Amino acid sequence: MLDRLKSIEDRYEKLNELLSDPEVVNDPKKLREYSKEQSDLQETVEVYRRYRSASEQLSDAKAMLEEKLDSDMREMVKEEISELQEEIESLTDQLKVLLIPKDPNDDKNVIMEIRGAAGGEEAALFAGNLYRMYSRYAELQGWKTEVMEANMTGTGGYKEIIFMINGNGAYSRLKYENGAHRVQRVPETESGGRIHTSTATVACLPEAEEVEVDIHEKDIRVDTFASSGPGGQSVNTTMSAVRLTHLPTGVVVSCQDEKSQIKNKEKAMKVLRARIYDKFQQEAQAEYDQNRKSAVGTGDRSERIRTYNFPQNRVTDHRIGLTIQKLDQILEGKLDEVIDALIVEDQASKLQQAES
């Protein structure tokens, strides 16, 4: 571990030199690339330097015990040794986590797709609750939400809604939301007061850059049609809605949220690129992970990950056995307590795999 940390520190120092090189300063692409790499390494280097300093102090303190000391001084040195050993143990744990390979998609924006599943209109209303929850969470983080496509029902729910959240590290926080979300509550239309169970599925895709997914125009079929509102009625006499079909993979994306066909096509291309990138990522991950399961789930969108129980104001994340009696707060976007617990569990699982 120490050899690896030394090489990381050497690379960090080299990057500092490169970032002051006039040739790099005048090359925006290199400057951006090196700045990001330096930023990614900075925390590891800072913790490593604290670890090294504490180790040197511990060595000096142990050497002092070999000298002639009065009883008071000896006790002070022993106390210092004990404190330094605790600090080194804590820093070692931090370094182990920092050395876990980082998900290359973590810094990206995220495209989220929510669909009402089992439960009819109640599932569509729950999909609307989830969309609002993620929108509020994004707002609390200072991120921006942009709707790409929405299929609204007559009662204000969503059969499907696709939206992008733009913000540094958005994917790193929201990628754990992949899966089936279950709601237990009494529907407004239920006169008997019986609790119904409905589900909605959430898919989280990292936004893919053009350089990451090579899509040729000849591989895309473009269809245009008149956009429609709730219930399917036409709301636009112009052919502004766009449907893109990627012929090699069969991935289909529609967008009718904008009045302009050009803007709808741009939005649809972003979603198409993300879905194709995600498809390749899923295939590669499945091959790599055949015999491994993450503690927070496989990312399978059919996997039930969380239950929202309205009568008891309770949220349960089934992957880590976490239960919180704060449903009202969570639906207002206060998701950090759940997401932080998932990240800790995921890191512990990866650390265990790395050490096995």
From Swiss-Prot:
It comes from the Bacteria. InterPro entries: PCRF, Pep_chain_release_fac_I, Pep_chain_release_fac_I_sf, Prokaryotic/Mito_RF, RF-1. It is found in: Cytoplasm. Keywords: Cytoplasm, Methylation, Protein biosynthesis. The modification N5-methylglutamine is found at residue 233. One of its GO terms (molecular function) is translation release factor activity, codon specific. GO terms for cellular component: cytoplasm. Methylated by PrmC. Methylation increases the termination efficiency of RF1. The keyword Transcription regulation does not apply. NCBIfam families: prfA (TIGR00019), PRK00591.1 (NF001859). Belongs to the prokaryotic/mitochondrial release factor family. Peptide chain release factor 1 directs the termination of translation in response to the peptide chain termination codons UAG and UAA. This is Peptide chain release factor 1. It comes from Bacillus licheniformis (strain ATCC 14580 / DSM 13 / JCM 2505 / CCUG 7422 / NBRC 12200 / NCIMB 9375 / NCTC 10341 / NRRL NRS-1264 / Gibson 46).
